[in-house]
From Swiss-Prot:
UniProt keyword annotation of Secreted present: no
The organism's taxonomic lineage, starting at the top: Bacteria, Pseudomonadati, Pseudomonadota, Alphaproteobacteria, Hyphomicrobiales
Domain of life of the source: Bacteria
Origin species: Methylorubrum populi (strain ATCC BAA-705 / NCIMB 13946 / BJ001) (Methylobacterium populi)
Protein name: ATP synthase subunit b 2
Keyword line: ATP synthesis, Cell inner membrane, Cell membrane, CF(0), Hydrogen ion transport, Ion transport, Membrane, Transmembrane, Transmembrane helix, Transport
Location(s), subcellular: Cell inner membrane
Region annotated Disordered, chain positions: 1-38
Pfam families per record: ATP-synt_B (PF00430)
Membrane topology field: Single-pass membrane protein
Assembly behavior: F-type ATPases have 2 components, F(1) - the catalytic core - and F(0) - the membrane proton channel. F(1) has five subunits: alpha(3), beta(3), gamma(1), delta(1), epsilon(1). F(0) has three main subunits: a(1), b(2) and c(10-14). The alpha and beta chains form an alternating ring which encloses part of the gamma chain. F(1) is attached to F(0) by a central stalk formed by the gamma and epsilon chains, while a peripheral stalk is formed by the delta and b chains.
GO molecular function: proton-transporting ATP synthase activity, rotational mechanism; proton-transporting ATPase activity, rotational mechanism
Bilayer-spanning residue ranges: 46-66
Length: 200
């Protein structure tokens, strides 16, 4: 049986033990106290591949972002901006309506106050005119009653004075007749009564 030579390419970081030909076994061992290889991303001979994969991943991510995520974000932002603009326009419209309603309310309030003052003044004038008319009517009635009362008093006074003159004449005639024994003549009696001061 012919012997064959086994040629192997040792790893840069591996310790290799070469077994001479004729040995039944070939062993590749690492020292028990040794460490493993470097972290793969830090190995210099893989930098180019890593950069290529990084560029591919970045390009794919950029493509996905530009085609999927960014349009959605742009649509959301546009929709939100549209809603904000609509809300602002609605708020401005409502503010304008509120201002107009406030101005109309103030105008109507001023008009109502002016009407109320005019009605109050008209009522006062009407009441004053009615009061003046009633006062004048009462004064006229009182004047008429006073005039009638004065006329009645004068008539009754004249009547009473006439009665007093008659009674006084009769009394004087009786006294004279009693004293002299004869009744006085009417002319002398009237002269005596006329000379007597009137009693009021």
């Amino acid at each position: 049986m012919a012997e064959q030579n086994i040629l192997t390419t040792p790893s840069p970081n591996a310790d290799t033990t070469i077994v001479p030909p004729g040995s039944p076994h070939t062993h590749t061992e690492q020292p028990s106290g040794g460490h493993g290889g470097a972290f793969p991303p830090f190995e210099s001979h893989t930098f180019l591949a890593q950069l290529i994969w990084l560029a591919l991943a970045f390009g794919l991510l950029y493509y996905l972002m530009s085609k999927v995520a960014l349009p959605r974000i742009e649509a959301i932002l546009g929709d939100r901006a549209g809603r904000l603009s609509s809300d602002l326009n609605e708020a401005q419209r409502m503010k304008a309506e509120a201002d107009a309603a406030g101005a109309a309310y103030e105008t109507s309030l001023r008009e109502a106050q002016a009407k109320a003052q005019a009605i109050a003044q008209e009522t006062r004038n009407s009441l004053s005119a009615e009061a003046d008319a009633k006062r004048k009517t009462l004064e006229a009635e009182l004047n008429q009653r006073l005039a009638a009362s004065e006329a009645t008093i004068r008539a009754r006074t004249s009547e009473a004075m006439g009665n007093v003159r008659t009674i006084a004449g009769e009394t004087a005639s009786a006294i004279v007749e009693r004293l002299t024994g004869q009744a006085p003549d009417q002319a002398s009696l009237n002269r005596a009564l006329d000379a007597t001061p009137a009693v009021h």
